[in-house]
Amino acid sequence: VTSITLDLVNPTAGQYSSFVDKIRNNVKDPNLKYGGTDIAVIGPPSKEKFLRINFQSSRGTVSLGLKRDNLYVVAYLAMDNTNVNRAYYFRSEITSAELTALFPEATTANQKALEYTEDYQSIEKNAQITQGDKSRKELGLGIDLLLTSMEAVNKKARVVKNEARFLLIAIQMTAEVARFRYIQNLVTKNFPNKFDSDNKVIQFEVSWRKISTAIYGDAKNGVFNKDYDFGFGKVRQVKDLQMGLLMYLGKPK
């Protein structure tokens, strides 16, 4: 299993961007090009199913498991308040044996299936967000926020609310920034500060399949055959979407 590490002790915007590039480079197939663009495309499913992301702070490491063929979250690993490594996983996404290979630090006895599912709505419900529209948008994004949310699960007794908030922020700061340069640029522009998320961030996040499909099936030389509206105005040039990574949809058309 490949590991990619983000050091959260005084990181720079450049280090963060190179971390995001490593995620893209690990999952992309360099030979795949969709819609006459140079946007990275995830490769077809392979034997290596998972990618391990390590967040390092001065107090220790918390790790995230992502599926390489779509960057969906499958599990996370953290020490509890007695310094025992515990792996928590979404049972529909990964088996116990696969989890052992991904996070060998946690014994089978210390693996626990999460009581909720891996979709944003289910995680948001468990995050108990009370303000605004009660979605992940209300939490904001940014490196400082990633660090504080990680520390809430690092060497602590498990608190579901803190765990769910960590997952919401960690997923966006890894998988979503890899998919969308628009979100990555917000993180680097505000680096390392926490910033308010906007509707466009959420629109991008819920439109990855839709955008990938449009580029794959209805773009030529980087131009769509018609205007597309993904929830933030009409787009004709693919480059205006600032995509970082496309979903695997088969051989180019």
From Swiss-Prot:
Gene3D superfamilies according to UniProt: Ricin (A subunit), domain 1, Ricin (A Subunit), domain 2
SUPFAM superfamilies, per database record: Ribosome inactivating proteins (RIP)
Matches recorded under Pfam families: RIP (PF00161)
UniProt superkingdom: Eukaryota
The entry's keywords: Hydrolase, Plant defense, Protein synthesis inhibitor, Toxin
UniProt record, GO biological process: defense response; negative regulation of translation
Reactions it catalyzes: Endohydrolysis of the N-glycosidic bond at one specific adenosine on the 28S rRNA
Active site (catalytic residues): E176
Xref: InterPro entries: Ribosome-inact_prot_sf (IPR036041), Ribosome_inactivat_1/2 (IPR017989), Ribosome_inactivat_prot (IPR001574), Ribosome_inactivat_prot_CS (IPR017988), Ribosome_inactivat_prot_sub1 (IPR016138), Ribosome_inactivat_prot_sub2 (IPR016139)
EC number assigned by the record: 3.2.2.22
Molecular function as annotated in GO: rRNA N-glycosylase activity; toxin activity
Functional summary from the UniProt entry: Ribosome-inactivating protein of type 1, inhibits protein synthesis in animal cells.
Protein family according to the UniProt entry: Belongs to the ribosome-inactivating protein family. Type 1 RIP subfamily.
Name the record gives this protein: Ribosome-inactivating protein saporin-5
